[in-house]
Amino acid sequence: MEKSGKVVGVCLSQRRTDLKKNVGKGILIKGLGLAGDSHAGSEKEVSLLAIESIQRLCQETGISARPGCFAENITTEGIDLTSLPIGSKLQAGEAQLMVIQIGKDPSQPHTYSYQGYSILPREGIFCKVIESGEIKVGDSITVLRTCKVI
């Protein structure tokens, strides 16, 4: 498992039903999530998805997609997100995150579909912010600890 990678997208939307836009940088706030995002303050504060998952789907289906198209807040490169156990801690730019959920039930409300495809439920992870800080495209994202919370 790769222990570090980089941030290739910092994405937000004003409304839950809108496509997220890669704004390049943002502030992750403890107990809230990505400042300015429609999902900030929810139980799943921040969502992460690997660009490799997006690229694989594009290659398999012929669609074109970019960071944010699948409703993720942070698009990563070079780190195997779904292999991280719940409770893992990540350093993402200046902020620290804790993995609280791997994937999600695709039948849940607000499961976003882009051109009929929804990969966040099976290949994304959800985190809470445990230390506030800035995050921007090009920042490293590093696994600090992978011990499971009981």
Predicted regions and their residues:
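Metal-cofactor-dependent catalytic cores
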Residues: 1-150
